Regions:
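Helix-terminus/linker motif at the lipid-water interface of multi-pass membrane proteins
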Residues: 30-52, 121-128, 184-195, 257-290, ...
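N-terminal transmembrane alpha-helices
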Residues: 9-41, 45-46, 62-74, 78, ...
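Small-residue-rich hydrophobic transmembrane alpha-helices
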Residues: 51-114, 148-162, 166-167, 280-342, ...
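Transmembrane helical elements of multi-pass membrane transporters/channels
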Residues: 20-39, 140, 174, 207-211, ...
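Alpha-helical transmembrane segments and their lipid-water interface positions
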Residues: 32, 36-39, 43, 65-72, ...
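Short runs within selected transmembrane alpha-helices of multi-pass transporters and secretion channels
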Residues: 72, 76, 141-159, 167-178, ...
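Interfacial/gating helices of multi-pass transporter permease domains
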Residues: 43-62, 94, 128-133, 197-198, ...
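Short alpha-helical transmembrane segments in multi-pass integral membrane proteins
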Residues: 1-22, 79-146, 192-249, 306-371, ...
Length: 452
């Protein structure tokens, strides 16, 4: 039995509360997914080189972006814990300290990407045409780092205090801005220059800047700044607060960076199989993005609620919450994966009109769907471990899995040179290991006494 207060009969969070936190996250991520979908749809009609370059550039950019998002996720865990403790006035200083750090960090990363990419990428991307287009893409995409890092700390604040409605409408504005700019800058419409793959990058960066302004405006107008300690900007400059945030966030940054770095290594390995294989993998990446953001929204919402439960002193209800989130996620994601399996050609046709590419990509759809099904449990359980505050345990689990993942990519792809579908099967092994290790830790680890 569930109550209207957001609690069920056991004192844990109800399905209604889970939905109220998760669905705005889900909607915002669906909107953001449209950015990648429109990039693929537009660039797929430019050339396979443009499609491959956007894939390589996006993953390379993501490798740096996750450093900031990992830091912000650590801040979110702290914010959720303080919110559960009802220590509201300490939340603002956490946001300020995290925000100041991320602004400086983004500027350093932008400079690094600008000056290092022409030296690094030719050594790892075999195709000269894809390499040149990737560098062109990054020259414009890197400016979005500042905007997405600032936005990340705002998202952490709203997810941490379980007020996620703002995520929805800000994402709608960002996506519509991106679609219009994409069409104009890729193909030279609306009087804008025809920039091709660089236009897709610039459109994304501008759209992210617009989203950042939405968060700033909403926070100034609709949030009780005094309640959450946003009037304590001087105390936020205290190094001890940044140190506290860093103790939690540092390991999330490392885990996120290494995880995406390994994923980039996977793309580099596939690129060595040829431009067609990379194009197939890029289609799979785009299609797997939709189930992933569904899964990610449930995992993020669940992690926030777990942090709040821990702050309320209700660690004994964490497993009860995990089971509810898992049931909810499987009910939502599984029908989509069944559709992928039953209608692969129809789904692929949304992204490309190349019949040969569609034919070669069909086997990939089956493998990708199986991996995504396992990812439902894997990602939710992994974020549950992080939500308890057991950051080092989560990082240890990830590093162990990634070591095995790299071995499988090295041997299974670079040495054996399989089909794209067989190459993607390493995801199945990775998700299975994540499920196993997370369950073992949640049953036998000492996370219930974790203090932050």
């Amino acid at each position: 039995m569930e109550t209207l207060s957001g609690l069920d009969s056991q004192g844990g969070y109800s399905f209604k509360k889970i939905a109220s936190v998760t669905l705005p996250i889900l909607f915002s991520m669906l909107m953001e997914y449209l950015i990648g979908m429109t990039d693929t749809a537009f660039l797929g009609r430019v050339s396979e080189v443009a499609l491959g370059a956007s894939a390589m550039g996006s993953v390379y950019f993501l490798t740096f972006f996750v450093l900031g998002s990992g830091f912000a996720f650590g801040a979110q865990i702290l914010i959720g814990r303080r919110n559960g403790e009802q220590n509201f006035s300490s939340i603002g200083p956490i946001c300020y300290a995290g925000g100041f750090f991320l602004i400086l960090f983004s500027l350093l990363l932008m400079a690094f990407i600008k000056f290092s990419s022409p030296a690094i990428l030719p050594g790892i991307i075999q195709s000269e045409s894809i390499c040149a287009a990737t560098i062109e893409y990054l020259d414009w995409r890197l400016y979005g780092l500042l905007f997405v890092f600032i936005t990340a700390i705002y998202r952490s604040f709203y997810v941490g205090i379980a007020r996620t409605a703002v995520l929805s409408w800000s994402s709608v504005i960002m996506v519509f801005s991106n679609i219009l700019l994409n069409y104009g800058l890729i193909f030279g419409k609306y009087g804008l220059p025809e920039m091709g793959v660089a236009g897709a990058a610039l459109a994304s960066s501008i759209a992210e800047g617009i989203a950042m302004l939405c968060y700033i405006g909403y926070t100034c107008k609709r949030v009780d700044l005094k309640k959450y300690g946003f009037d304590r900007i001087r105390s936020s400059l205290d190094f001890s607060i940044l140190k506290q945030v860093f103790q939690v966030s540092f390991w999330m940054m490392v885990q996120s960076f290494v995880s995406v770095g390994v994923w980039f290594f996977f793309y580099v390995a596939v690129e060595h199989l040829g431009e067609r294989s990379l194009a197939v993998i890029n289609l799979a990446r785009t299609l797997s993005g939709l189930p992933f953001i569904l899964i990610h929204s449930f995992a993020t919402g669940g992690s926030s609620l777990i942090s709040n439960l821990m702050g309320e002193g209700k660690a004994h209800l964490v497993w009860h919450l995990i089971r509810k989130v898992l049931c909810f996620a499987f009910a939502v994601v599984t029908p989509l994966l069944i559709f992928y399996i039953l209608f692969p050609e129809l789904t692929l046709g949304i992204y490309t009109d190349n019949t040969a590419l569609i034919r070669d990509s069909v086997p990939m759809m089956y493998v990708m769907s199986a991996a995504s099904f396992l990812q439902i449990a894997a990602f939710i359980l992994f974020n549950a471990v992080s939500g308890t505050g057991a950051i080092r345990a989560a990082v240890s689990i990830e590093f162990c899995n990634l070591f095995l993942y790299v071995l499988m990519v090295w041997i299974g792809i670079l040495r054996l040179r399989p089909s794209p579908a067989a190459a993607w099967s390493v995801e199945i092994y990775y998700q299975t290991l994540t499920i196993l290790f997370c369950i073992l830790y949640l049953f036998f680890g000492k996370w219930k006494e974790k203090k932050l």
